[in-house]
Amino acid sequence: MKNRTFATIDGNEAVAQVVYQINEVIAIYPITPSSPMAEWSDAWASEGKPNIWGTVPTVVQMQSEGGVAGAVHGALQTGSLTTTFTASQGLLLMIPNMYKIAGELTPTVFHIAARSLAAQALSIFGDHSDVMATRGTGFAMLCAASVQEAHDFALISTRITLESRIPFLHFFDGFRTSHEINKIELLTTEDFKGFIPNELVIAHRSRALTPDKPVLRGTAQNPDVYFQARETVNPYYLACPEITQKVMDEFAQMTGRQYQLFEYHGDPTAERVIILMGSGCETVHETVDYLNALGEKVGVIKVRLYQPFDSQRFIAALPTTTRGIAVLDRTKEPGASGEPLYLDVVTALYEKWGVGSLPTVIGGRYGLSSKEFTPGMVKAVFDNLAATIPKNHFTIGINDDVSHTSLDYDPDFNIEPDNIVRAIFYGLGADGTVGANKNSIKIIGEETNNYAQGYFVYDSKKSGSVTVSHLRFGSQLIRSTYLINKASFVACHQWDFLEKFPILKDIVQGGTFLLNSPYDQDEVWERLPGKIQAQIQQKQLKVYVINAYKVAREAGMAGRINTVMQVCFFALSNVLPREEAIAEIKKYIRKTYGKKGDQIVQMNIKAVDTTLDNLHELVTREYSAPPQIPNHHYPLSPEGAPPSSIPYILGKMIAREGDELPVSALPNDGTYPTGTAKWEKRNIAQEIPVWDTDVCIQCGKCVMVCPHSVIRSKVYEPEQLENAPSTFKSANAKDHDWHGLKFTIQVAAEDCTGCGICVDVCPAKNKAQPRKKAINMEPQLPLRQAERENWDFFLSIPNPDRRELKLTHINQQQMQEPLFEFSGACAGCGETPYIKLGTQLFGDRMIVANATGCSSIYGGNLPTTPWTQNAAGRGPAWSNSLFEDNAEFGLGFRVSIDKQTEIASQLLQELATVVGRELVDDILNNQQNNEAEIWEQRDRISILKQKLQALVNPELTSKAQLLLSLADYLVKKSVWIIGGDGWAYDIGYGGLDHVLASGRNVNILVLDTEVYSNTGGQMSKATPKGAVAKFASGGKPAAKKDLGLMAMTYGNVYVASVAMGAKDEHTLKAFLEAEAYSGTSLIIAYSHCIAHGINLSTAMQNQKAAVDSGRWLLYRYHPDLVKQGKNPLQLDSRTPKLPLEESMYLENRFKMLTKINPEVAKELLKEAQTDVNLRWQMYQYLAAREVTQG
């Protein structure tokens, strides 16, 4: 056996390394958690890396997974070795083509990071729902249980498909395998070449469509032959299992790693056996070893080839002593007599068991949406099998108090050996903790003889969410595919987490605790929450503290504390000699940040060099009794709330205790209340804006740009200040319309993310201190309590009357209450200010169809939602369908609302003699064109409802009841279709185009970040020429799609292109005009993004630079102007005055290319400048045309 190379990589990279080498065409589209496989392929192709045949694979990005499947089908039909990667809904979009590919016996492998399907809710996490939905397509299914298996099966499945002609799904668990980092043995180029015989490749090519040997495929067949034709493939499927095992045996001869279609592990005379597939196999494997060492007789069968299901080999793998079988499925099929694997096992046993009585077979569900699957749960399943009457169709890992399917288990059951080092790190999204820990586990895996495993837990929030890193390393193979619950090392990178989460729950006696503290060493002990003090003393922990933010700030890295904490970990863990560890950290810094420029590299290295001087051991008191220091609890704390209440449910989720919620606690249809984000109080900002009353000019700009709606302004009567807190600030209102009133700008300190955009846009200058403005950043912690009281008081002040505000004046319009607040978006997000503005203007009558993407995640991800309500209980109604159908989904809203309004109007006419003709006429004739008319209409509807409720005439009651149920539709509803550029320009463009052509009164808001932000920054058709993005590693060669111009060609669509940072009044005007327009409206909003490689605190300057250079145009196309004899296109940008280079190179996404490939960067910049010039000239021409009517 040849010497082997090891690498510490995650499952996605492990698969991509193989797939890239043995394919010629790779069609891609981003979807979590499979995207990194496509990203690696694109990056290698961009570098010119060849495959085993010496050619660089063609990597082509499509507009959707449906498009990918079509491209794959076409490439396969013309003889190329072709593959793709996907998951979840993406895989479902491929199903029609999968039937075709399989029906034509075309070899290919789709590599799937298996993920939940959107049902009552979307979930990005892992289970087998997606792959099980494809069972009827004819694709074979090969399942990998670990990173090593995923690496190996990528090669094995490709060989099998070429030999069998059966297309394959090679799948592995999303996140648990796709994103787990593990030390694996790598296959080599020689392995690939030896394992993929040329004759199989030639045979595939010989079946290609070519005019040199013309044939016809894809015919339409009639009833006389279709049935028979379907049966012709049977011999291929019957042969597939034998071919698969033969290939696995050959692989074993080459590598020493033997796989079986059904691999048994356990006692040879086992009486109880669990059958499953995927990463759960590893947990069962190690639990079987533990239980058998205690004298049990148990085993596990790991299913590798699921389809075609070889019943004979399955029976042969079972010990003949088997008396009880538990089949575990990682999916749910409501209404079925059992889940898929269970049904196949039952069928196989019934058909093939032979002599003697059948074993008892029970089925169960586990692990949906990456729900934990632990040794304690495995033991519970074995215990259930040992019961006199085992529970069938059970669930494990949840508390089902509705259908009573769940098994009880011991959550503290632990089987991990003491010689495995286990460490947990609690970080904040975007503080670099996860990235640093990925590098740490790679250093350990590659620079020591240890096996290593890294797994990272984060919710779907953007930066600012909690991340938990789980690192294991030791001298033996690590099979523990579950979270650590006994850690020898715990690091807390955010002080506030001490009050929010059970940070020290899983640390062992005598363990090491590393804490990032904002306080000096001498203050730390007194500042610790009482519960933490008690745990430190009771568990006799060694505690080390560092002010990582101070070290990072002094190194010029602001909030990026990852490098600092990484150095501390290596210094305390002793896994490597200290100097060697620091050298490796610096090596990985250069590798990780080299493309971002030497300045970033040097800042990180400076942080490394200064860290250990700031790391101190904390001297704790002798233990006597738990200190009586009150703990902080969330306003939505589960303590004190009834178990059935929404506050209790959301409180448990916020406290990271959602796993404890029973089935009965959750809504059965996925419906949740709005207005809950205000209870979360994340306290993640190190600094918050503080208002200077003397300098402020009361322009409202800071309020408008605040991405999280934490800055608010109000005017009010002076007497409202009578009970104000002593630190509450106010000033005399400066607007002439508010003479004699008081004015306040207030910040929600505990909801602020500290982005600083408000400071950047503030136009006011402090003449005494030129570096100061009317709003300035100051440390949050000393201000928190006072600002909490000030915020509560501010909310008690009545809002200004919306009917009296001048909505075209920003300072007045920003007095409107936002009905979108405190989202989980990135600090400094460029999308949310537009959404917030829409809710301020129209939120109390708004219904929103939101495409899957960033805006659906920060807008609709549990536990809390930023969409909220006003004091009257009105606010945006929000829903997300899918990524690809959002435009159609929103059109459905409009069609339905219009129909219900029509029915209500008809009923109103029919009941006019009863409710009063005058009231009916007033309701039906009200145009509802402004706030005053909307308010009047609501008052009339209230009177109407009172009259309807008073009716007692039996003949009228049914109509009255119907009208009562529809009366609110007589108030104008504002339908908004919201999504990002990945939706609008790519996957959803067909539907969007149809809605634009419909003429229906919907408002479409495209939050254009110019990349697929939600999936990690991949290229879309909105990505500008020359930008480096994932899937465009060598810089995007094509120009940005002009969505606005395409929409204008219909002639009856209102179109606006806006950039708040360039011209906020223009943005406001566009929103008002779009909503007022009676047809279809489209607003394309420039939205800066963290993926642009910019400082988000000054991102509004980037927007302005984009407009000043002509890269982004401001315009409004208003069809109604044609009726007035005017040109409908109003070009609101001025002639570009900034060279494009100066705008582009403010952003790292453009600047990176100058380092990667300077010549290409120079050429693309030249082309992009030409494109900008030509586009400006075209829009100038279009806006200057004279319009003639009729």
Swiss-Prot record:
PROSITE patterns documented for this protein: 4FE4S_FER_1, 4FE4S_FER_2
Function, in words: Oxidoreductase required for the transfer of electrons from pyruvate to flavodoxin, which reduces nitrogenase.
Lineage, broadest ranks: Bacteria, Bacillati, Cyanobacteriota, Cyanophyceae, Nostocales
SMART domains found in the cross-reference section: EKR (SM00890)
Domain 4Fe-4S ferredoxin-type, chain residue ranges per copy: 687-716, 743-773
Protein name in the entry: Pyruvate-flavodoxin oxidoreductase
Catalysed reactions, as listed in the record: oxidized [flavodoxin] + pyruvate + CoA + 2 H(+) = reduced [flavodoxin] + acetyl-CoA + CO2
Cofactor section: [4Fe-4S] cluster
InterPro entries to which the protein is assigned, alphabetical: 4Fe4S_Fe-S-bd, 4Fe4S_Fe_S_CS, PFOR_II, Pyruvate:ferred/Flavod_OxRd, Pyrv-flavodox_OxR_EKR_sf, Pyrv-flavodox_OxRtase_EKR, Pyrv/ketoisovalerate_OxRed_cat, Pyrv_Fd/Flavodoxin_OxRdtase_N
Enzyme class: oxidoreductase
Binding site residues for [4Fe-4S] cluster 2: 706, 752, 755, 758
Highest taxon listed in the record's lineage: Bacteria
Binding site for [4Fe-4S] cluster 1: 696, 699, 702, 762
Classification via SUPFAM superfamilies: 4Fe-4S ferredoxins, Pyruvate-ferredoxin oxidoreductase, PFOR, domain III, Thiamin diphosphate-binding fold (THDP-binding), TK C-terminal domain-like
Assigned keywords, A-Z: 4Fe-4S, Electron transport, Iron, Iron-sulfur, Metal-binding, Nitrogen fixation, Oxidoreductase, Repeat, Transport
Family label: Belongs to the pyruvate:ferredoxin/flavodoxin oxidoreductase family.
Enzyme Commission code(s) on record: 1.2.7.-
Annotated residues for binding of [4Fe-4S] cluster 3: 826, 829, 854, 1089
GO molecular function: 4 iron, 4 sulfur cluster binding; iron ion binding; pyruvate-flavodoxin oxidoreductase activity; thiamine pyrophosphate binding
CDD domains recorded: TPP_PFOR_PNO, TPP_PYR_PFOR_IOR-alpha_like
GO BP: electron transport chain; nitrogen fixation; response to oxidative stress
Cofactor note: Binds 3 [4Fe-4S] clusters per subunit.
